[in-house]
């Protein structure tokens, strides 16, 4: 289920922007049954910004909670490759097989819809709210 969509505008090298990112990572959600849910894992793309910023936030939030990732456009590469050891910066820099991930996601999005209360393996569920796509 897609639970939320958060867009954080600002410069990634400014602490004020990073504090808003921290708030999004630490946000709590309430399930319909009252159970509190937190975000247990975040992948943060290092492309396009100084990777050191992402590495520092990974260390701040926990190296297994915030995973720095970089794309690898190699057909057939696994969706994500978790290294066995930390890199020189002390974090686990994961590679994302972007072509493979897109192929899997697009295939799952083509699946016939099922009722929301019906358990469906590997289903992607979006809210019934057109604003989520804007």
Predicted regions mapped to residue ranges:
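Mg2+-dependent endonuclease catalytic cores in nucleic-acid-processing enzymes, primarily RNase H-like
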Residues: 2-133
């Amino acid at each position: 289920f897609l639970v939320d969509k958060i867009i954080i505008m600002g410069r990634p090298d400014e602490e004020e922007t990073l504090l808003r990112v921290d708030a999004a990572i630490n946000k709590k959600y309430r399930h319909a049954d009252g159970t509190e849910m937190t975000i247990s894992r975040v992948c943060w793309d290092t492309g396009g910004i100084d990777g050191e910023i992402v590495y520092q936030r990974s260390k701040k939030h926990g190296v297994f909670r915030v995973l720095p990732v970089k794309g690898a456009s190699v057909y057939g590469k696994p969706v994500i490759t978790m290294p066995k050891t930390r890199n020189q910066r002390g974090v686990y820099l994961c590679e994302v097989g972007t072509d493979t991930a897109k192929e899997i996601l697009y295939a799952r999005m083509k699946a016939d819809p099922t009722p929301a209360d019906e358990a469906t393996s590997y289903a992607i569920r979006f809210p019934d709210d057109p604003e989520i796509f804007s």
